[in-house]
Amino acid sequence: MDSEALGPADLAGLAEVTEAEIGRMVDLGVLVPSDGPAPFRTTDMQKVRLATACERAGLPMDAIAALIRSGRLSFAFLGAAPYHRFAVPSSVTYRQVSRDTGVPLETLRETLESMGFAWTSPDEAMREDELEVVPLIRLAAATEIVDQVWITRVGRAYAEGMRLAAQVENEAYRARFEEPVLASGLGQRQAMERASEIAGEFVPLVDRALMAVYRRQQELIWTEHQVENIEAALEEAGAIVRPERVPAMCFLDLAGYTRLTEERGDQAAAELAATLAVLVEHLARGQRGTPVKWLGDGVMLHYREPAGAVESALGMVRRVPEAGLPQAHVGVAAGPVVVQGGDYFGRTVNLGAWIAA
């Protein structure tokens, strides 16, 4: 998003508020206009959006403005480069895009909502980042390779994966930067301004790293699928004979985790969970296993073969206490499972959970 000069009406339109609201924020000192008929910049939109979000959450705008005037708080950091990437409304509505692309409005709405976007009316302007998704939706609808159920399922997986990544990034920022900076005596204003400067270096590298990680995961999943297809073809041709294989589910539960949380606090519990995640990921990968769902004090894992699940489970029972974690209870069950949306269901799953309990 390029920073352009805007008049009050233009800024109100971008931020989706009234011009009177812009005037009120100027009077309060939340917005600081320059001289001339176009006293605002496109980046002021983020200040309006943040102030509006605070007010909708029940935070008094007058009190926020008082902190800004006293120098204890500032929205100036929102003008930094990392915030220029956030999308603004486009010049076309959902209805217009639907008409121009041939994608039904309901398909457009369901797919965008599955990816974390939201709309209230087909006649409101689409965000520019939503427009980036439209070609994919159009191609999926035109080729019919995936139906609406599957495209929304894939969209939900994209959104959940990215939401988790953004959430953990934010947790890392708070723990490793914001809290230490505030503890050093600097105020919230200085902390946010310094963070914006540093983020300018990190953000482009994070974008590249995310795509690299995604492509690596595609390589792993696609290769595994191709190997299974080749194996099936060889079996069908009689070139190899394999015994029938069934997957296995493994559940790991830390004994006394709740009591430990109460005694040591939430931060200690979070650190234990992080240690467990690294250990489990390492042991599972060596036995063709994959962590499927983290359950706070435990984890559910899927294995391609029961032997790998048993070997991995024994390693977890042995290694978990060595890592300074509470004793682990594990349960392993082999049998057919139902896979949907990246999760696993069925009697095998329930039995594994029951054994670990």
Outline where the language-model segments fall:
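Arg/Lys-rich, alpha-helical DNA-contact motif
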Residues: 1-235
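Short, solvent-exposed loop/turn segments at secondary-structure boundaries
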Residues: 37, 123, 263-264, 341-345
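Short, conserved loop/turn and helix-capping segments at secondary-structure boundaries
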Residues: 42-45, 128, 266-270, 274, ...
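Residue-level signature of catalytic and energy-coupling elements of molecular machines
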Residues: 111, 280, 296, 332, ...
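Short secondary-structure junction motifs
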Residues: 121, 289, 325-329
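Hydrophobic alpha-helical membrane-association signature
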Residues: 154, 202, 272-276, 312, ...
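Catalytic NTP-binding/metal-coordinating core of nucleotidyl cyclase/transferase enzymes
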Residues: 232-315, 319
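Catalytic beta-strand-to-alpha-helix segment of the class III nucleotidyl cyclase homology domain
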Residues: 302-357
